[in-house]
Amino acid sequence: GRKLEIVLASIREPQDFAGLPTISNGSMSLIPPNWAQSLAADGNGILFADEINTAPPSVQAALLRVCLEKVAGDLELGAGTSIVAAANPPEIAADGWDLAQPLANRFCHIDWELPAEVVAAGLVGNWPNITIPKATVEDIERETREESWKLAGFLSSRPELATAMPASTGQQGRAFPTPRSWEFVLRLMAHANAMNLRPEIKRLLVIGSVGQGA
């Protein structure tokens, strides 16, 4: 069990992620929110940011540093902290819009549908138990070296895919290739290979990081 902090981005202010400015002894600092202090104290928790595409642009901008650097205010959440977000598609989200491109590029996007039979089973207390595969540090490091050569070779042959901004409005707020998201692919594939995950899962991770076209 890992500590979980759920934050509804749609009802938050920028300072709930960027920190509250305060002046003490002639210097300014950013006081981190309570959820950040709780996660930092734990060191291995999960931040679940819900409804991020109904958060105003100023809040989405404040989320950038949290997502990439794992820093809220002046507080580091710790390398062991994981960040997960959820959003309904803009066409069905109430007052929703596409994610800003800088924020969208900081996530692996996975479309999630909950089967009716799973919901029915969960209503009577039978939610499925999921076993998370394990991998050793040595295996991950080995796979990282191997995948880095594969990825370098691919981008050398397809340099136009190193960075490709979304070309249509339908792709706004989704995954697209940049050096940052290719690094996501490298790390995800290294872990997936070390865990012996199925090919279809690896495909979802790649598409979720750099988009369908890449």
What is each stretch, according to the model?
Residues 1-150:
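AAA+ P-loop NTPase catalytic core and its hallmark functional loops
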